[in-house]
């Protein structure tokens, strides 16, 4: 073995006072700075644990077990850019550079209103003709996942004056309003009618996309109102295509935007597309599996496990396994 004189003991947070000369060593703990003059670190398991004199039993290479200064990032290096969503990792990166404050965009405040006298709150007993209000919770939670703040959640009866009151309240407290239901042509489909009566400006009132083609966008007292379909999957599609895009624009965050990607089908799809159609799917490595059956726009259960919306372009029909398609990750 090689014998070295121990001239200093260094714990994390303590700066070295000695310069290590030939035949000398310092006992050092993980996280402590390496003293000048040293050129390698020996694991204590390879020594006799000596205090004044230490015996080294295994040869070392220069700079073994070093954590070089600047290996994570260098002075002046750009670590985070404008438009990124601050998650746990990015907050940790900022903290590791000594940043205690970061300029961020305030959370977008969103009001969610589901319309329909048939809607019942989960946990209550259904009366004849009622269904549970899944869209209120689905849309609200998705907005939170995208970084929004849900400032109001209301289920509204199919009564014009009640709906007007809820919309006025929402416009006063929210930057963005999302409604579901009441956008088709039924006698009790009141959302468009009520918004028009309130003087809301119509941006568009239909989209050439299925499901959810009656989807509309209004501006009420300068607050955008996305009026989505009452069918849960149709509402999900336009939550991703339109509302998500609006939230991404609010934050200036390209990561949140619903960008199209290209992949390959692992299963067949036999329906034709008169307009662009979006269907649910599960993507892995650019390969997309479609759920077996249960594709109607009112069905939500087959979305369990799905992580993308697959775009079937207008005019395409009878897609076969292996064909290329566009998709949006959820």
PLM regions with names:
Residues 4, 41, 71-75, 113, ...:
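A broad, low-specificity signal for short, low-complexity segments enriched in glycine/proline
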């Amino acid at each position: 073995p090689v014998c070295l004189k121990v001239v200093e003991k260094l714990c994390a947070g303590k700066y070295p006072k000695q310069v290590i000369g030939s035949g000398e060593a310092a006992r050092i703990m993980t996280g402590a700075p390496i003293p000048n003059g040293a050129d390698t670190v020996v694991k204590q398991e390879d020594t006799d644990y000596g205090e004044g004199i230490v015996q080294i039993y295994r040869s070392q290479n220069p700079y073994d077990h070093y954590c070089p200064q600047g290996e994570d990032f260098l002075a002046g290096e750009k670590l985070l850019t404008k438009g990124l969503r601050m998650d746990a990792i990015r907050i940790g990166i900022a903290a590791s550079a000594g940043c205690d404050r970061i300029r961020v965009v305030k959370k977008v405040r969103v009001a969610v209103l589901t319309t329909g006298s048939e809607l019942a709150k989960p946990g209550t007993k259904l009366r004849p003709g009622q269904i549970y209000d899944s869209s209120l919770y689905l849309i609200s939670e998705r907005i939170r996942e995208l970084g929004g703040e849900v400032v109001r959640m209301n289920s509204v009866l199919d009564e014009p004056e009640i709906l007007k009151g809820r919309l006025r309240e929402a416009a006063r407290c929210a930057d963005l309003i999302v409604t579901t239901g009441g956008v088709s042509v039924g006698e009790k489909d009141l959302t468009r009618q009520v918004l028009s009566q309130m003087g809301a400006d119509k941006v568009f009132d239909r989209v050439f996309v299925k499901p959810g083609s009656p989807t509309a966008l209004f501006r009420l007292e300068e607050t955008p109102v996305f009026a989505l379909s009452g069918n849960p999957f149709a509402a999900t599609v336009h939550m991703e295509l339109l509302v998500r895009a609006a939230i991404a624009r609010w934050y200036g965050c390209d990561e949140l935007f619903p960008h199209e990607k290209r992949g390959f089908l692992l299963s067949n799809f036999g329906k034709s597309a008169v307009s662009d159609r979006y269907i649910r799917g599960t993507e892995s490595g650019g390969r997309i599996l479609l759920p077996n059956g249960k594709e109607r726009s009112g069905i939500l259960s087959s979305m369990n496990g799905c992580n993308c919306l697959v775009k079937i372009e207008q005019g395409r029909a009878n897609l076969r396994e292996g064909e290329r398609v566009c998709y949006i990750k959820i």
